[in-house]
A protein has these predicted regions:
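S-adenosyl-L-methionine-dependent nucleic acid methyltransferase catalytic domains
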Residues: 1-141
């Protein structure tokens, strides 16, 4: 790996998602008739908030079991990775519930997981000359 290549771990969305839980939350959200913005106006291309929250979170969080090489630190073993992945899935399961829309403890857990992934990615690229600009570009595109 050359000096100028960014070291970006795989994101959770690239590996696995709890799709059944996300789908169930989307179906349930679609059936809500009180207090939901969709009750004001029937928009023809409405997307469930549950799916959007799950996808955004999973695209910002590193997968715990990524295999790395060429200057990266080695990923953790499969059992530990699956345990940490389940913890991230639990956050997703909580994020997609309509009742947790403004639940600050759930949002804090999600923010902490995103911050930990960001710190990990920054630590992997600590010696890269253009690390901040390139990491932001790769993350936000």
């Amino acid at each position: 790996m050359s000096q100028n290549e960014l070291k970006i771990p795989k994101k959770l969305i690239e590996v696995n998602l709890p799709l059944d839980d996300i789908n169930d939350a989307c179906v349930r959200e679609k059936a809500i008739r009180h207090g939901h913005p969709s009750t004001l106006h029937l928009y023809w291309a409405r997307r469930p908030l549950a799916a959007a929250r799950a996808i955004l979170f999973a695209s910002l969080v590193n997968d715990p079991g990524y295999e790395v090489g060429g200057g990266f630190r080695r990923g953790i073993n499969k059992k530990e990775a699956q345990k940490k992945r389940e913890e991230l899935f639990d956050i997703i399961r909580d994020l997609v519930k309509w009742e947790n829309l403004n639940n600050q403890s759930v949002l804090a857990r999600a923010r902490d997981a995103i911050k930990a992934s960001w710190r990990e990615t920054c630590a992997l690229n600590a010696n890269h000359p253009e690390r901040v600009r390139k990491i932001l570009w790769v993350t936000l595109r």
